[in-house]
Amino acid sequence: MSIDKSKIMKAVGKPVRMTYPGSEGTHRGVLNFREIAWSGKGRTGALYCTVVDIIRFDGKREPWLRIGYYRQPTGTTLPRWASQTTYCGPLSQWRNNVLPVLQKLLKRAAQSIA
């Protein structure tokens, strides 16, 4: 059994919304681009995949990047959006703040398994 990529990719080009906790409101936009990283089976046999999305939110001057995941329970054919929360932010924030930290962590992880 595998996750049907077309079911996950069908969201590209469709409206999305993101609601902040509290009183910060809701962003609405369009999912412009998506890449899938296959994660494999969990301990219960459910299938997982991580998605990296580029979203163009209304009124924002640059696209935002979001990372989330889908889960397909054993015995089903429909993957479901499973991220309770996601990290979503402008591309410049990822480039300037998040990617340098991820690079450090990946380097440490690679050294620890070498």
Feature locations, PLM:
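Mixed-charge, Lys/Arg-enriched low-complexity segments
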Residues: 2, 6-7, 71-114
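Compositionally biased, intrinsically disordered low-complexity segments
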Residues: 19, 39, 55-58, 101
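Negatively charged, low-complexity tracts enriched in Asp/Glu with abundant Ser/Thr
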Residues: 1-48
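A short, structured beta-strand/loop element
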Residues: 47-82
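Weak global preference for isoleucine
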Residues: 3, 8, 36, 54-55, ...
